[in-house]
Curated annotation (Swiss-Prot):
Keyword tags: Hydrolase, Iron, Metal-binding, Zinc
Protein name: Enamidase
Cofactor binding, note field: Binds 1 Fe cation per subunit. Binds 1 zinc ion per subunit.
Residues holding Zn(2+): H67, H69, E164, D276
Gene: Ena
Family designation: Belongs to the metallo-dependent hydrolases superfamily. Adenine deaminase family.
SUPFAM superfamilies in the record: Composite domain of metallo-dependent hydrolases (SSF51338), Metallo-dependent hydrolases (SSF51556)
Subunit structure: Homotetramer. Dimer of dimers.
Functional description taken from the UniProt entry: Decyclization of 6-oxo-1,4,5,6-tetrahydronicotinate to form 2-(enamine)glutarate, followed by hydrolysis to form (S)-2-formylglutarate.
Top-rank taxon: Bacteria
Length: 386
């Protein structure tokens, strides 16, 4: 049995928006899962465990990027960039959710081809995780000709996500709604493009389209990159219970509006964070951290709640056993602190001030995969593996 203990933690941010902060300073990990959370008494049974001294800094769940356009491996054809997933890991991202693979060279746009591509990419990312990141690839793009039997086959082969509705030849609610119903019947999670056209061949999607189609996730409610109006945002927020995704590669003004209005309505649990990259905007390795900083510093949202938007809110939508610090959850964790030179005293203070926190350690399934981030500024107090 492998065992890791993180001790001397200054603050634990749980990722659970109902209880964002845990009163504890020690986390025990066994065989890749969180086994216990408590105080120094947990060190009594340390045995030959690997000990990580957090040096008084903050531990959060590993971050989720709920909007990634992966195309196979750790390569982004749209921007001709290698190792973007590895770079995101150094920004604290331990799980990625595909929103479809529209940049795949020669992407097939028929039913057989889109199904085959989804199955291939899903299996490939589960077979080989780039840099250890948990990539849920192979989100199927809806194309004309798909049948209910296709969804049954895809689910059997491991595909469980429908990429942004509107990226393929299925564009209007009349065509999309029956496929979404099949997808839900067979256990898929469904995303839907929202806002202006993003790539040639995609479509503009309104609040009315979203309401009629009934996805699980309103993809980039703040635009990808062109946003719907605040009136359309209000309709989605008031007339549905769908998850609302704020992305880094979108409209910051609408992101602020969504966060503030969700807070007013007591609906911050519906807000999740993605990057919407690779895209024409580019690649932003620290995009999820930037979302957290933006929403906390500019929209008056508590930084601990902003962390939940990047972690537990997302895993609740997608049904994943990570993103929350609790016994039995996968031990995907970040140790972070205020960066050198910040006005803040700790990581949450830095996020509230708009400063990117410094990451000193990232763990996936309890194994340290980053021991000093190459992309964040240096942490004032760096964790050490003893």
């Amino acid at each position: 049995m492998s065992k890791t203990i993180i001790k001397n933690i200054g603050k634990i941010v749980s990722g659970d928006i109902k209880s964002p902060v845990l009163q504890a300073d020690t986390i025990v990990v066994e065989d890749g899962l969180i086994a216990a959370i408590g105080g120094e008494e947990l060190m009594k049974d340390a045995g030959d465990a690997t000990i990580i001294d957090a040096a008084g800094s903050t531990v959060t769940p590993g971050l989720l990027d709920t909007h990634v356009h992966v195309s196979g491996g750790d390569y982004a054809p749209r921007q001709k960039t290698m190792d973007f997933i590895s770079s995101a890991l150094h920004g604290g991202v331990t799980t990625m959710i595909s929103a479809g693979s529209p940049h795949f060279p020669g992407r097939p746009k028929d039913a057989a081809g889109t199904k085959a591509l989804a199955i291939t990419l899903s299996k490939s990312y589960y077979n080989a995780r780039p840099a250890g990141v948990k990539v849920h690839g192979g989100a199927v793009i809806l194309e004309k000709g798909l049948t209910e039997e296709d969804f049954i086959e895809m689910k059997k082969e491991g595909v469980w996500i429908v990429g942004e509705v509107g990226l393929g030849t299925i564009k209007n609610p009349e065509d999309a709604a029956p496929m979404v119903e099949w997808a839900h019947k067979h256990g898929f999670k469904v995303q839907m493009h929202t806002g202006g056209t993003s790539i040639p061949g995609s479509s503009t999607v309104t609040a009315d389209d979203v309401i009629k189609t009934k996805p699980d996730v309103v993809s980039h409610i703040n635009g990808g990159p062109t946003a719907i109006s605040v009136q359309e945002v209000d309709r989605i927020m008031d007339e549905t219970d769908f998850a609302m995704e704020i992305v880094q590669c979108g409209n910051p003004k609408i992101a602020d509006y969504v966060a503030r209005r969700a807070a007013e309505k007591g609906q911050l649990g519906r807000v999740i964070f993605g990057n919407d990259a690779p895209s024409g905007t580019g690649l932003i390795p620290l995009g999820i951290l930037r979302n957290m900083c933006q929403i906390a510093s500019m929209s008056d949202i508590d930084p601990e709640v902003a962390v939940c938007m990047a972690t537990g809110n997302s895993t609740a939508v997608y049904g994943l056993n990570t993103g929350v610090i609790a016994p039995g959850k996968e031990a995907d964790l970040i140790i972070m602190d205020t960066p050198l030179g910040s006005v803040a005293e700790d990581a949450m203070g830095a996020i509230a001030a708009g400063d990117i926190p410094g990451i000193s350690v990232v763990l996936i399934d309890g194994e340290a995969v980053v021991t000093k981030s190459r992309n964040t500024p240096p942490a004032k107090r760096a964790a050490k593996i003893l």
